């Protein structure tokens, strides 16, 4: 009887071992298939007619993805978690489009660009400026634009703003929370030992406002950054020095004179070329590259599908 039991157990163990090997082989084949599929992946073929290449960053511009590496198209289509777009992917698309005879022009869509840092946006702008040396034009449209989005949009040869739109140009600032009063009410004693004047780290614990010394060092840090931003905009829009500052400081009075028309105030200060709707923008580009019979929009290819 024991012999029979051992035979059954031996059979079961061999069966389990065989299934394990089969699963391992299947996984290996799947892995090989994935590698083969990735290596055989080809760039989306460009249509024979001329078209516009659309630069449409989603989420933050980054130098390296924070999670598992995805293609630019996967990043653009993903709705899970914060979105990111690799700067190098967009730069590569722009550089390739410069030499591509099928690409007639560039279109910038900054509507989904999140706060990324001026340095990364400037990298993208530099690639766009280089693209323009080919003689090809760059177009952009905005319903509304944040300060960072506008820095990207301003590099366009032709920038259209929606008649109901506005630009968020307010400068840059640095804020600090102070909770000395709250700590006092909670009966928390704070003891700080410091040497010198410009020691701002403990100030939130011992003050209710910003010290003169802390304000001085923050201003010294922010002024060059803001000056660099203004110079970039004024160069891109071919405006005189101080034009951005003049726009911001004159906004209250300017809007009063225009009965609150933000878009007209932006146009009056030459921060955009023209006002128009999305339909107006598409109609203009249809004249440039023709109409796609399926979408009834202009012939276009997104950078996510281009590279």
Question: What spans do the regions from the language model cover?
Answer:
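Short acidic-hydrophobic, aromatic-tinged amphipathic segments that line or gate anion-handling sites
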Residues: 160-161, 272-278
């Amino acid at each position: 009887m024991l012999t029979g039991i051992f035979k059954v157990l031996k059979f079961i163990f061999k069966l389990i071992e065989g299934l394990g090997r089969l699963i391992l082989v299947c996984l290996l084949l799947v892995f090989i298939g994935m590698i083969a599929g990735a290596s055989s992946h080809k760039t989306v073929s460009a249509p024979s007619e001329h078209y516009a290449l659309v630069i449409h960053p989603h989420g933050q511009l980054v130098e390296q993805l924070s999670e598992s590496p995805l293609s630019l198209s996967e990043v653009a289509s993903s709705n899970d978690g914060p979105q990111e777009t690799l700067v190098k992917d967009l730069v590569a698309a722009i550089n390739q489009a410069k030499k591509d005879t099928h690409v007639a022009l560039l279109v910038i869509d900054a509507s989904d660009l999140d706060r990324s840092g001026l340095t990364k946006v400037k990298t993208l702008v530099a690639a766009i400026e280089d693209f323009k040396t080919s003689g090809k034009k760059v177009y952009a449209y905005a319903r509304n634009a944040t300060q960072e989005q506008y820095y990207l949009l301003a590099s366009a040869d032709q920038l259209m703003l929606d008649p109901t739109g506005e630009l968020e140009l307010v400068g840059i600032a640095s804020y600090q929370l102070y909770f000395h009063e709250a700590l006092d009410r909670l009966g928390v004693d704070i003891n700080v030992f410091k040497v010198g004047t410009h020691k701002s780290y403990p100030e939130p614990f011992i003050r209710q406002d910003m010290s003169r010394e802390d304000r001085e060092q923050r201003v010294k840090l922010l002024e060059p950054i803001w000056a660099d931003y203004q110079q970039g905009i004024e160069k891109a829009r071919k405006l005189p020095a101080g034009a951005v500052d003049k726009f911001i400081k004159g906004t209250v009075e300017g809007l009063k004179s225009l009965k609150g028309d933000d878009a007209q105030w932006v146009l009056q200060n030459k921060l955009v070329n023209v006002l128009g709707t999305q339909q107006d923008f598409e109609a203009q580009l249809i004249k440039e590259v023709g109409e796609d019979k399926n979408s009834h929009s202009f012939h276009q290819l997104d950078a996510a599908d281009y590279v």
